[in-house]
């Protein structure tokens, strides 16, 4: 009986946003982005935002701001020139987001298994790949 009760409590604690829909957010000022890679193969990566001034955390901001899942294995995130680049490894994509609204402004596709993105200057980006012995430029 105790196992059943504990299991029921665990299921109730899960985040459930129902059908995918978009939510508006107040413009963020300063804070910390937190990527959670999720479970490999489960398509449950997430992105959260911590506001240290307000001492609040907004979880699942990607799905809530865009009405779509982030994907499978959020590997890393980099901020560059007013944009956020979220590298989603097993989905083979790099999402470009507006860091103030968390909304997607673009996507970089055509990479097999991206890991990290680095900007050596304002016009070049390097994307490492887990399975290929090359760096995308």
Short names for language-model regions:
Residues 52-53, 98-102:
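Short loop/turn segments that connect beta-strands within beta-propeller blades
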Residues 93, 99, 112:
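Active-site-adjacent structural elements in enzyme catalytic domains
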Residues 34-42, 79, 84-90, 126-131:
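Conserved beta-strand positions in repeat-built beta-propeller and related beta-rich domains
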Residues 23-52:
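An edge-strand/N-cap motif at the start of beta-rich repeat modules
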Residues 1, 6-32:
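Bacterial Sec-dependent N-terminal signal peptides
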Residues 67-80, 111-125:
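Beta-rich, blade/repeat-based domains predominating
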Residues 135-137:
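Conserved small/polar residues in nucleotide/adenosyl-binding loops
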Residues 56-69, 103-108:
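A short beta-strand motif characteristic of beta-propeller blades
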């Amino acid at each position: 009986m105790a196992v059943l009760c504990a299991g029921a409590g665990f299921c109730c604690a899960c985040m459930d946003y129902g059908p995918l829909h978009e939510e508006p957010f107040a413009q963020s000022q300063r804070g910390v982005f937190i990527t959670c890679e999720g479970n490999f193969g489960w398509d449950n990566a997430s992105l959260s935002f911590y506001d240290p001034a307000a001492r609040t955390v907004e979880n699942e901001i990607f799905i809530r701001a865009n009405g779509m899942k982030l994907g499978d294995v959020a590997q890393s995130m980099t901020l560059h020139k007013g944009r956020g680049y979220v590298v989603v490894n097993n989905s083979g994509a790099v999402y470009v987001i507006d860091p103030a609204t968390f909304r997607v402004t673009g996507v970089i596709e055509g990479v097999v298994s991206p890991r990290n993105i680095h900007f050596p200057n304002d016009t070049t980006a390097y994307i490492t790949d887990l399975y290929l012995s090359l760096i995308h430029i």
